[in-house]
Amino acid sequence: MSKTIATENAPAAIGPYVQGVDLGNMIITSGQIPVNPKTGEVPADVAAQARQSLDNVKAIVEAAGLKVGDIVKTTVFVKDLNDFATVNATYEAFFTEHNATFPARSCVEVARLPKDVKIEIEAIAVRR
């Protein structure tokens, strides 16, 4: 049985979906765009957008009682694969800052994202 994960520390869903689901041993987040949950603002550059998206994922994972180190898989959606190196640097710094092992990851270029942001990130975390 799944439980809905909801937190004010990540942006509210902008469609008919939830921020995340808790399956007991596994947490699955919805894709997180770089919206600051307090201000509703979106940073301009892709590095700041990547960081905000990761912070939003972290907030959902933590709302389920887990931590960044429990994330085992992410999917990164970018509007421009030329941003790959910048996103990688931000991503590496984020997981290093949280003393977390890098999770498995997919990264794909997409034509468009909600609110015309440059990046969206979703994650799977597990209870150990």
Curated annotation (Swiss-Prot):
PROSITE patterns: UPF0076. It holds the Pfam family Ribonuc_L-PSP. Substrate binds at residue 105. It comes from the Bacteria. The record marks 17 as: Stabilizes the substrate. Keywords: Amino-acid biosynthesis, Branched-chain amino acid biosynthesis, Cytoplasm, Detoxification, Hydrolase, Isoleucine biosynthesis. It catalyses: 2-iminobutanoate + H2O = 2-oxobutanoate + NH4(+); 2-iminopropanoate + H2O = pyruvate + NH4(+). Pathway: Amino-acid biosynthesis; L-isoleucine biosynthesis; 2-oxobutanoate from L-threonine. Its EC number is 3.5.99.10. It is found in: Cytoplasm. One of its GO terms (cellular component) is membrane. GO terms for biological process: isoleucine biosynthetic process; protein homotrimerization; response to toxic substance. SUPFAM superfamilies: YjgF-like. The record marks 120 as: Important for catalytic activity at high pH. Belongs to the RutC family. This is 2-iminobutanoate/2-iminopropanoate deaminase. The lineage of its organism: Bacteria, Pseudomonadati, Pseudomonadota, Gammaproteobacteria, Enterobacterales.
